Regions:
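Glycine-rich phosphate-binding loops of nucleotide-dependent enzymes
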Residues: 2-263
Length: 263
């Protein structure tokens, strides 16, 4: 395989990514690839730089130095909205749903980067706008079904915690991402909810061809679902490889996995 073929197989390439806050180096010269149709997990202790790296991938933070290429294009200076339009979606550690909107309307809200109707068309309810709205509602319902959400008209705040987490993923899918960033999606879940969400993440790859970058502290989830795992410590990459390789890395066993290595 040529270098060009290798590059073409990566949906995201990060080179020398560094982020400095004042005198604190939060992420230090990290190289990182995400292959197409893969699940890559980013692990490390609190303060390792994982969420900072996420925020730079999504465009919420500017890099201090280094570069990102997405789908072969340099996106280093693109903001979050532009990257979302190109196909980078994300969820956050804390649930950010519209609590007094229905599950369906929450997903519709996630389609704002894809809808083409104009304000004038919306005011006068043009045929094109009505057709786009029907199609959007059908697609939102399909995404709720895919995520396993039954109560389409239920307020988001009244859904179970597990359903709220899956609703966040459904809303992120509404923007038609090619790469989806999931920041601790199983946090606070019981084992049954975790199993359902883990299965959903796997289906993103298998059924929709979406690449996933995952921050996750539950090592059983990381080791069971990831194609590759990268470990950060104090903002630096200390290990990278297939789950079985990372699992056997003495630095990782000592610093991050601990007793979870047997899980």
């Amino acid at each position: 395989m040529s270098d060009r073929d290798i590059e073409a197989a990566n949906i995201l390439e990060a080179r020398g990514i560094t982020k400095v806050f004042g005198g604190l180096v939060a992420v230090n010269s990290v190289d990182f690839n995400i292959p197409e149709r893969s699940i890559v997990s980013l692990i490390g202790p609190n303060g390792a730089g994982k969420t900072t790296f996420f925020n730079m991938v999504s465009g919420l933070y500017e890099v201090s130095s280094g570069s990102f290429r997405f789908l072969g294009q340099d996106v280093t200076r693109f903001g979050a909205h532009r990257r979302a339009q190109m196909g980078i979606g994300r969820t956050f550690q804390n649930i950010r749903l519209f609590g007094t909107m229905s599950a369906l309307d929450n997903v519709l809200a996630g389609m704002h980067t894809r809808l083409k109707g104009s304000i004038v068309g919306a005011i006068f309810a043009s045929p094109g706008t009505r057709r786009e709205e029907r199609e959007a509602r059908w697609r939102a319902a399909e995404l709720l079904d895919f995520a396993g959400i039954q109560g389409r008209e239920v307020f988001a705040k009244n859904l179970s915690y597990g359903d709220q987490r899956r609703l966040e993923i459904a809303r992120a899918l509404a923007s038609e991402p090619k790469l989806l960033l999931l920041d601790e999606p199983t946090a606070g879940m019981n084992p049954q909810e975790t199993a359902r969400l883990t299965e959903l993440i796997g289906r993103l790859r298998e059924e929709r061809g979406i690449a996933v970058l995952l921050i996750e502290h539950e090592m059983r989830v990381v080791m069971s679902i990831s194609d590759r795992v990268t470990v950060l410590d104090h903002g630096e990459k200390i290990s990278e490889g297939e789950p079985a390789e990372v699992r056997q890395d003495p630095k990782v066993i000592e610093a991050y996995l601990g007793t979870a290595r047997t899980g």
